[in-house]
Structures are given as C-alpha cells and as structure tokens.
From Swiss-Prot:
Top-level lineage group: Bacteria
One of the GO BP terms on file: carbohydrate metabolic process
Keyword Transferase: yes
GO cellular component terms given for this protein: plasma membrane
Family: Belongs to the glycosyltransferase 28 family. MurG subfamily.
Designated name of the protein: UDP-N-acetylglucosamine--N-acetylmuramyl-(pentapeptide) pyrophosphoryl-undecaprenol N-acetylglucosamine transferase
Keyword presence, Oxidoreductase: no
C-alpha cells in the first residue's frame, strides 16, 4: 500500500488528488496523511479516493521563532513516530510527499523508518522542507528545469480547454483561500470592464464573499461571485482571460485549459517563488506578470484590452502534458 502526504492549501492537495486517482485507477490502495489545519479535511475527509485518511495536529515551522519553533519541531518528531504505527498497520511500502507543512510527519517518518520516499516539488523554487528531505528521497519530481512539463493535473482541465478568440469574459482568481488584493483590483476594474461589455467571474474566498457581492451590487455591475468551487474548470471554460496569483497548481491548470492569464504573484511567498513559477511563461510570451507593489490599474486595463489572447491560447495548448500523473506514477511503481 502507498501513502500520500501533504497539503495545507489547494495547490498541494490538487497534486495529491491527481496522483491518488492515477494509483486507484491502477488498482492500488492509497491512504492519506494530512493535517487538521488548512484545507486537508475539506478536500478529503469524505472522499472515496483514499482507503484510509489520517489528519494530525501538525503545524508549519518556517515562520515560527524561538521556543515556538522548537515545540513545532518536537511535535513533528512525535507525529513521525505515530506514522510508524500507520505504516505497520497498512503495510506501507512507499510515501509520496506533495509538500506543505502537512507532509512533514509522514515524510520524516518515511526517512526514519526506511520507507521509500518520493517527493513532488510543485514550485520553481524548492521549499525548505523539500530541500532538507531531497537527499533522502528515492526520487524527486519537479516540472521545472525539464524538457517536458509533466505536472499532475486533473484531466477535466484539458477536457474543458478551448482556444480563445475574443475577450468577452474575465475571471479573477485569488487562489483556494481568496486574495484581498485581487478582490480589490477586480472591483476597481469592474466599471471599466462593464463599459466594454466584458463579463466578470470572480472567486473571492469565503472571508470577503458578502462584502464583494455587495460592492458589485452598489456599482450596478452584474458579476458571478463565489468563494470556492470544486468545479473551477467550468468557470475557466467560460472565460477568455484570467487575472490570478501564480500558485503552481493554479498556473498549470490555467495552462491545461489554454486560458490566457495575467499573473500577479503573491509578493510575500517564500523566495518569491510565485514569480519564478510564472517566469517561463513570460519568457515565452505566453503570459503577462505584474508585481503587486506599485501596480497601475490603468496600465493593466490597457494591457487587458490589447492582449493577443488568441495567440497566447494557441501557444498554451501543448505546453503541459495531459499525462503528468501517469508519468510520475509509472516512475514510482518501477522503483
């Protein structure tokens, strides 16, 4: 049996889901080891993809200091030993880590108790946990720095892809938890977009859902506003342009959907990794990147109206393999 571990945010969990589905389709039994914090339970507590699911009281370490960091590290070690019981009970031979603080206990447990550890790094810049564990893993997967981009993406994003020809609808994405800056930007652009007959679809996160809806209503702008959706590909398919953060899973899903995107990387992401996630698209003239600090909405709006969405959409069609999960699982099962 194989264990998949990691999560915290939608980006990590999307990879866990894609790899688990591929394993299940091959008749493999899979368990999930995640955290009580973050979105792990929301994604998988009632999912039938995994044979068994475990959610630990794990916490991030990177942003903690002093005694709080020490306690967090001790908690990871304690939970790693708890994983030993899970490994034994389910005869776990391999652990696949998809990153995030949720992955720490089972990943360290795999190293300590000599289980095969496989790591998928989703970002262009390695996270600290993956950097520490890389020398001890059986195989390290990254979709950056390779000739083919084999990021594990749900096939639904490919199935709903289309080439865009005309800007009729714009999608604002703030990630699985929403983003205040993206929300504010969307509202600031709303009247200009309305005046050019451009429809708005806006994922704003749960915290600002009612406020965002109220502000659109006050302006007299009809917009599709929602907090979170398990069918985000439906909204992508309806859209001709996206404005989004540059979290890895969202970025690759947008590529798979051939949806032209203007990325505004989260400026406080570790090592500015969101900028580097999207840089290869910028270098290939397949995306625009704006820095959040000092962004001029008038310049951005001009770019929105002048962007050649057809050529970008055409260029995105074949940039990522639809068989990313298959390619990765093939390599894991051969080890």
């Amino acid at each position: 049996m194989i264990a998949i571990t990691g999560g915290g945010t939608g980006g990590h969990l999307a990879i866990a889901k894609a790899l688990a589905i591929e394993l299940k389709n091959r008749g493999e039994n899979v368990i999930f080891i995640g955290s009580n914090s973050g979105q792990d339970r929301m994604w998988f507590e009632h999912s039938d993809i995994f044979k068994f699911k475990y959610f630990f009281p794990s916490r991030g370490v990177v942003n903690k200091k002093g005694i709080h960091k020490l306690f967090a590290l001790l908690n990871i070690i304690k939970l790693a030993f708890k994983c030993r019981c899970i490994f034994t009970e389910h005869n776990i031979s391999s652990v696949i880590s998809v990153g995030g603080y949720s992955s720490a206990p089972a990943s360290f447990g795999a190293v300590i108790f000599r289980k095969k550890l496989f790591i998928h790094e989703q970002n262009a810049i390695k996270g600290k946990l993956n950097s520490i564990l890389k020398p001890f893993c059986k195989k390290f997967f990254s979709s950056y720095g390779t000739d083919t981009y084999d990021y594990p993406i749900d096939i639904k994003f490919f199935n709903t892809a289309r080439v865009r020809n005309e800007l009729k609808t714009i999608l604002f994405l703030g990630g699985s938890q929403g983003a205040s800056f993206i929300n504010s930007l969307a509202l600031n652009l709303a009247l200009n977009l309305k005046n050019h007959n451009i429809n708005i679809i806006h994922q704003c996160g749960a915290k600002e859902l009612e406020t965002t809806r109220s502000k659109y209503n006050e302006m007299g702008v009809e917009a599709v506003v929602f907090d979170f959706s398990n069918e985000i590909e439906v909204y992508m398919q309806k859209s001709d342009l996206c404005i989004s953060r540059a979290g890895a899973s969202t970025l690759w899903e947008l590529c798979a959907n051939a949806l032209p995107t203007i990325f505004i990387p989260y400026p406080y992401a570790a090592s500015n990794h969101q900028f580097y996630n999207a840089k290869f698209l910028l270098d290939s003239n397949l995306a625009k990147i704006y820095e959040q600090n000092g962004l001029d909405k008038n310049i951005l709006f001009t770019d929105i109206m002048n962007l050649d969405i057809n050529s970008i959409s055409m260029g995105l069609r074949n940039i990522v393999s639809p068989n990313g999960a298959k390619i990765i699982i093939d390599k894991i099962l051969k080890q």
